Amino acid sequence: MFSESNLFNNWNSNIKKYHEKQLEGLSIKSIETTKGIKLWSEFRPVDVVGLYVPGGTAPLFSSFLMQAIPAIIAGCKDIIVCTPPDKNGKIDPTILWVANLLNVKNIFKVGGSQAIFGMTYGTKSIPKCLKIFGPGNQYVTLAKMLVSNKVSIEMPAGPSEV
C-alpha cells in the first residue's frame, strides 16, 4: 500500500531525474570561430518565475510538481504560485502539502486570468514575474496570450488542455 508521502517521493524522484539529466545537456560550450573570437551558449535561471496551478473542483497538484521541480533544479530564486480557492475560500490542502514538501512559500489565492495578469504586472501582494508557466482554461490561455508581449510564457494550451 502506498502512502501519500511514498507517492510524493516517487513522483518527486522521477521528475527530478528527468530534469537533472536535461540540465546536464545544457552545459556551456564555446567555440572559437576566428582567432580570438569565441561564441558560447549560456543558460541562466529565471529570477522570479510564476506558476499557475489550476484548482477549484480539481486541484492539479501534478501540474504543480511538474512546474515547481524544474524551477527548483534550474535555481530560480523566487517561485510564485497562484491557485484559485475552493468554494469556501481555501487553497486545496493537497496544493499546500506539496508546497510545504517542496519548500515553496509564495502562494497566492487567486485564479483565472486575474492570476495571470497579477503575475505579469505585479500587485500589492503578488510579485511581478519574468516567466509564467501553467495550464488553465480558455480564459487563462487567452490571458497568457494577451500578456505574452510583456512577460515570457511557455506556450498557449492546446485544444486537449482547454
What are the roles of these predicted feature ranges?
Residues 1-15, 42, 64, 88, ...:
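Generic structural signal for well-ordered, non-membrane alpha-helical segments
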Residues 17-24, 51, 73, 104, ...:
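Alpha-helix capping at helix-to-loop junctions
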